[in-house]
Amino acid sequence: MTYALSEDEFDSPQSQDINNKVFWDKLHDIFKVTLEMVKETAEEMGIDLDSIDHEEAAKQQEQVHKTAKEQPYCQAALSYIKKVDSWFGSNKGLLKDKADELQTLAEADIPGTRPADEAVSIQDCLEVVRWYQHQIYVKLCRAASGLIRGELEDLKYLPQDANGSAKVAIIGIERSIAAWGGLLNQFPQQEHPILDLLVNLKRLLRQVEAVFPDARAFVRLGFDTAVTNI
């Protein structure tokens, strides 16, 4: 069977307009041809598409996700989320007092003080912490899922996908460490709880690097041109 999938399918102005019925008719025709192509290819490979157990596949996927979430580094990332929420919940007054202090300094216009810059620095650190708080966990769960599925299904691309997700998590962890360091400079009275968070992040970083030793070297298309020094 010959398949004519080319620009000729969309050679008229009407067929290139996504709001035009002609466009969708052409796309539907290509969809049918593509399905037939897949069917023939599967037959040549001895694969019975009708024999695929979708319920079993869904169960396996659910088990993969469950196993991924149970990985020590995923559990550590989940624990970090809770610790961050606890810190913010316990320090609403501290943050408000600091804001009032900086506002007073700004109004006093005392030479040698830079309350506006200090406020921006604190806000930046807080935003970084919040931005990566959940992302680290999500990316590590995806990385774990890719690693597990790659081993189960012997698919080489999945470990690479896992490395990509792990790299994003590593970036998030290290930027979070830097942000907490900035907050520690601003709130020295919070030394104990912030150091506890930093220790947890550093331990998590070591776990991730041990499980995904190639993650740092992974090149993300559109983001990395070489090994990223974070």
Pin down the residues of each PLM region.
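N-terminal cysteine/histidine-rich coordination modules
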Residues: 1-33
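Intrinsically disordered, low-complexity linkers and terminal tails enriched in Pro/Gly
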Residues: 7-19, 47-62
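Generic alpha-helical secondary structure signal
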Residues: 21, 25, 36, 192-195, ...
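Long, hydrophobic/aromatic-enriched structural stretches that serve as scaffold segments
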Residues: 23-50
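Hydrophobic, aromatic-lined core segments that form the binding pocket/scaffold
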Residues: 51-230
